[in-house]
């Protein structure tokens, strides 16, 4: 599991594991913004995750950073590792649709989407997972939501999970 989380955060894949490109939120939007998919993209856009990178430019973030001796939170490793997807990923792992402006996007939790984003693969969960899809769990969240974070508040996984829930609606009929 750690290896998958490391890849989702943009670190190199361990030996013997495939490396896939990060396609960015745009790569997910086409399919995951439909009513049939529960408007999952809109749910993400309304979340703090989508604004995580931009939040580092706020006066509050700059104040917290200054207290920690950080000059620019939008350029510091301690901040970026949790405020954007694919931090430290080599350029060859970033598709042209990837953008740091996406903040903590789909691929932060679900892994690089290059291979599993195709509809024919996503229709089969097992096949999608074989092509890099990660089904996140509490450890995934706690890789960032932990006491090392300067603005940490107690993290209650079951409550947090409800705030970011984006299930696919059950088929009608």
Which residues does each PLM region occupy?
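C-terminal segment of classical bacterial N-terminal signal peptides
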Residues: 1-9
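Alpha-helical multi-pass transmembrane bundles of energy-transducing inner-membrane proteins
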Residues: 137-144
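Sequence context of c-type cytochrome heme-c attachment sites
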Residues: 8-102, 107, 113-136, 155-173
């Amino acid at each position: 599991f750690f290896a998958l989380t490391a890849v989702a955060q943009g670190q190199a894949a361990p030996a013997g594991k495939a490396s896939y490109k990060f396609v960015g939120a745009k790569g997910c939007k086409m399919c995951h913004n439909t009513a049939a998919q529960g408007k999952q993209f809109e749910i993400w856009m309304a979340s703090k995750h989508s604004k995580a990178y931009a939040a580092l430019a706020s006066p509050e973030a700059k104040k917290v950073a200054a207290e920690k001796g950080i000059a620019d939170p939008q350029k510091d490793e301690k901040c970026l590792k949790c405020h954007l997807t694919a931090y430290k990923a080599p350029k060859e792992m970033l598709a042209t649709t990837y953008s740091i402006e996406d903040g903590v996007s789909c691929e932060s939790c679900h892994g690089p989407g290059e291979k599993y984003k195709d509809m024919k693969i996503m229709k089969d969960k097992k096949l999608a997972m074989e092509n890099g899809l990660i089904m996140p769990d509490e450890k995934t969240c706690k890789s960032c939501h932990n006491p090392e974070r300067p603005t940490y508040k107690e993290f209650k996984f079951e409550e947090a999970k409800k705030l970011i829930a984006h299930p696919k609606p059950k088929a009608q009929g």
